[in-house]
């Protein structure tokens, strides 16, 4: 009975202390080459903990899939970037996560690298508010 109580206590502690995969507010730097500067935009994305494991002995019959916190549903919003040249397209469309879950990283829609550029990277070096 004590071991069951201990397991329950540890499970509750993990649920409280370790954030699960959930929506979070982030600030991203958006840029267009025609505008030559970056603008900070607030959006919603997924962050948190997903249970995963890396087996010591690899089984070729069973693929080892690491799960990451990623979007389940998203919508796109569009903003007009101020200060762009008159002849250029000053609209920028960016993703907004509306629901999150733990899943395999989809490299077709997500940067699955260990060290990506990050959401605040600006190739022009100048940020406009």
Swiss-Prot record:
Glycosylation positions in this chain: 25, 42
Annotated disulfide bonds: 21-69, 35-84, 38-122, 46-100, 50-102, 105-112
One Gene Ontology cellular component annotation held by this UniProt entry: cytoplasm
Domain of life: Eukaryota
PROSITE patterns: GLYCO_HORMONE_BETA_1, GLYCO_HORMONE_BETA_2
Annotated compartments: Secreted
Keyword Phosphoprotein: no
Residues passing through the membrane, by range: none
GO terms of biological process kind: follicle-stimulating hormone signaling pathway; G protein-coupled receptor signaling pathway; regulation of signaling receptor activity
Pfam family, one: Cys_knot
Signal sequence, start to end: 1-18
GO molecular function terms noted in the UniProt entry: follicle-stimulating hormone activity
UniProt keyword annotations, A-Z: Disulfide bond, Glycoprotein, Hormone, Secreted, Signal
Family: Belongs to the glycoprotein hormones subunit beta family.
Function statement: Together with the alpha chain CGA constitutes follitropin, the follicle-stimulating hormone, and provides its biological specificity to the hormone heterodimer. Binds FSHR, a G protein-coupled receptor, on target cells to activate downstream signaling pathways. Follitropin is involved in follicle development and spermatogenesis in reproductive organs.
Subunit structure: Heterodimer. The active follitropin is a heterodimer composed of an alpha chain/CGA shared with other hormones and a unique beta chain/FSHB shown here.
Protein name: Follitropin subunit beta
Organism: Meriones unguiculatus
Underlying gene: FSHB
């Amino acid at each position: 009975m004590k071991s069951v109580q201990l397991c329950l206590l540890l499970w509750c502690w993990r649920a409280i202390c370790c954030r699960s995969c959930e929506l979070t507010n982030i600030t991203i730097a958006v840029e267009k080459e025609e505008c030559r500067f970056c603008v900070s935009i607030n959006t919603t994305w997924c962050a948190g903990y997903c249970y995963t494991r890396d087996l010591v002995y690899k089984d070729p019959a069973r693929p080892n899939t690491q799960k990451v916190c990623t979007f389940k549903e998203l919508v796109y919003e569009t903003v007009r970037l101020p200060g762009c040249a008159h002849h250029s397209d000053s609209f920028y469309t960016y993703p907004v996560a509306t629901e999150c879950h733990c899943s395999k990283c989809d490299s077709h829609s997500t940067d699955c690298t260990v060290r990506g550029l990050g959401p605040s990277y600006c190739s022009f070096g100048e940020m406009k508010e």
